[in-house]
Regions:
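Conserved catalytic core of the tyrosine transesterase superfamily
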Residues: 1-239
Length: 239
């Protein structure tokens, strides 16, 4: 049975997927969001995220300031929590948003960096396609952006999800609802290249994994592994 923290992390990761897709935030900004939210949930010491009240948030913000965090950092943290609870209230049908009517510290904070089209292009071009892992990552990024998938949807694709002839991918979304998404010529081309030149070298004889995108151990990619790779490419591409 999943722990309270595990369930909270699941909600956090789904939220991060959503804002990356909807807002196009840079990997560094997304990492900061996630760190803010995970730190808060660790501080809660097992309290359910849906049980959090305004008083809990005020106590946490006070704790941060007493620990020496700057007003700028605390304002950013509150911004992360506000966005997260807007998502959670909609996701879990909660009536009361605990971040409502909480004022940010007076000092301003810089706006999160949003990826431009050039940034996205640089990120997609960052993997070394002469390497099987890099070729896999290039195909994943092409599919992610061409189809507008969440990371969780991307890593859950299997070989039967792709219809090469029709050029579509079958995606299992929220509530186990399926949808067909056109791949586009570029993404389809990279999937074909990955399947022909890289996937076989990543598969392991004694592991029969039908996942489309395999890790170097021949198993399905995890969200954590994908984000680690993205952060590396973001540094390489300077985005």
């Amino acid at each position: 049975m999943a722990s309270t923290l595990d369930r909270s992390i699941h909600h956090i990761d789904n939220f991060i997927d959503l804002i990356w897709l909807e807002k196009g935030l840079s990997p560094n900004t997304l990492s900061a969001y996630r760190q803010d939210l995970v730190s808060f949930n660790l501080w809660l010491k097992g309290k359910e995220i849906e049980a959090v009240k305004k008083a809990d948030l005020l106590d946490y913000l006070s704790f941060r300031l007493k620990e020496g965090y700057s007003s700028r950092s605390t304002a950013r943290c509150l911004s992360s929590l506000r966005a997260f609870y807007n998502y959670i209230c909609a996701e879990l049908n909660l009536a009361d948003n605990p971040t409502a009517k909480i004022d940010s510290p007076k000092q301003g904070h810089t706006l999160p960096k949003v990826l431009s089209e050039d940034d996205v292009e640089a990120l997609i071009l960052a993997p070394n396609i002469d390497d099987p892992i890099g070729l896999r990552d290039r195909a994943m990024l092409e599919v992610l952006y061409a189809c507008g998938l969440r990371v969780s949807e991307l890593i859950n694709l299997n070989l039967l999800s792709i219809n090469i002839r029709q050029g579509v991918v079958r995606v299992m979304g929220k509530g186990k609802k399926e949808r067909l998404v056109p791949l586009g010529e570029e993404a389809l081309s990279w999937i074909n290249k990955y399947l022909e030149e890289a996937r076989t070298s990543l598969s392991v004889d004694n592991i029969n994994d039908s996942a489309l995108f395999l890790s170097k151990r021949g198993k399905a990619m995890t969200r954590q592994t994908f984000w680690y790779r993205i952060k590396e490419y973001a540094l390489k591409a300077d985005v």
